From Swiss-Prot:
SUPFAM superfamilies in alphabetical order: Ribulose-phoshate binding barrel
Organism: Xanthomonas euvesicatoria pv. vesicatoria (strain 85-10) (Xanthomonas campestris pv. vesicatoria)
Annotated protein name in UniProt: Orotidine 5'-phosphate decarboxylase
Pfam families assigned to the protein according to its UniProt record, in alphabetical order: OMPdecase
GO MF entries: orotidine-5'-phosphate decarboxylase activity
EC number: 4.1.1.23
Amino acid sequence: MSRAPLPLAAHERLIFALDVPGHDEAIAWVDRLGDSVSFYKIGMELLASGEYFHVLDALAKRDKRVFVDLKFFDIPATVAGTIRRLAQWPVSYCTVHGWHAGMLQAAAEANHGDMRLLAVTVLTSMGRPDLAAMGIDREPVDVVVERALAAQAAGIDGVIASGQEAGPIRRATGPDFSIVCPGIRPGGPVGDDQQRTVGVAQAFTDGADAIVVGRPIRQASDPAAAATAIQDEIRAALPQNGN
């Protein structure tokens, strides 16, 4: 059975994508951003450095939340074993591939910690032509909602999906299902590899629990100020009785 979304304070609803090649660069970013960011996503680039869990441990010691974004996809037994081990670490979110019901169920059953599992639906870098090339001639929103419902039925706690689909997902799954949205572009589309993007306010108005932001902060002249500005947008978009 899916668990309720994490009880996130407003400042924890911004997740910074820590896409860097190693430990030293990661910690430099954490120090640079200071109190403007309290939640970090660590993914495949750091894993390849061999310093992944050193970074995870360093973030936890700084009282930061951690999102492990490794998109696990394998036979059910292998994914279950991985989730069982990872649940022993101080991890708030972890991604699993959202296209295999048996694997999703095995992952959910193996998750005995406080970690929330998020199913990957359709990457925000993909549009309908990309799906068609895979033999799926449907609109991304239809595929995403279908995958979200399948993940919920398997006991997964939420999904990671474009903010463009946050509203349809929320209406389909109800309030007790986590929605985390990457591909957020505070200033609008910028012509990078993200196709299905939205702004900060729209994501939260449509039902997102948290957003993932990378390049708009990382490439800003003052990254901490950029993160703080996004935090202000989040607070303005949340209900008045929100955290």
